[in-house]
Amino acid sequence: GLMSHFAVHVSPVYYLMLPFFALAPYPATLQVLQAAVLASAVIPAWKIARHHGLSGAARMLVCALLLLLPSYSGGTSYDLHENCFLTPLLLWMLYGLDTANIPIACISALLTLTVKEDAAVYVAVAALFSVVRSLLRGAGAEKKRLLLSAGLLAAAFAWFFGVTAFLSSDGEGVMTYRYKNFYFNDSSSLLTLVQAVFMNPMKAVYESMEPEKLGMLGLTMGALLGLPLITRRYE
């Protein structure tokens, strides 16, 4: 039978599309809205590039490459998925963290959390990166960014455990079956997953290095010419 999306995912971000869909209640409206959301990522991408001193031509190239990346824009032709919000919102959050802009970082992080329950992982990783960077730099000017990042990290954990508990009690439960090769003692808890990684880290390394996953990593990095690995700051 039919099942509500909200029985398996917590995605209130979809309500941002509701006013437009109410005006034009057609499937094509959702496709156009998804394309607009994806395209909006060029705004924070442009601002991040400008913040780091890239020229106007370089900024245009960055934005063009983002829009032309097949894995990014290809889904607009046939599908609708809440993950379309992730890239623009995460770029806004990274911009907010980069510039220590509290309103931008907090609002974009909050909206990212409303995309899906596991979107908290993206917020947590970005916040953790910012915490480590601030600690390594150690300058007094980093205190504001450090506190902001620590707050977002705590919020991401609180949200994740809150919404997963909600899905377990009032929904169909969290879709944890994809991690079943990490579970033990007949447990399907995400806490068991974390425990398994700490108890046997080589299992996590092995799972990450399977041939098909290495191929996927090669395709991903190849399309980006390895640019994510070219940096002067490896924190």
Question: For each predicted feature, which ranges?
Answer:
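Loop-to-helix entry region of an early transmembrane alpha helix in multi-pass inner-membrane enzymes
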Residues: 4, 11, 15-18, 23-43, ...
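Perimembrane helix-loop-helix junctions
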Residues: 122-157
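Extracytoplasmic catalytic-loop and juxtamembrane helix elements of membrane-embedded
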Residues: 1, 149, 157, 163-203
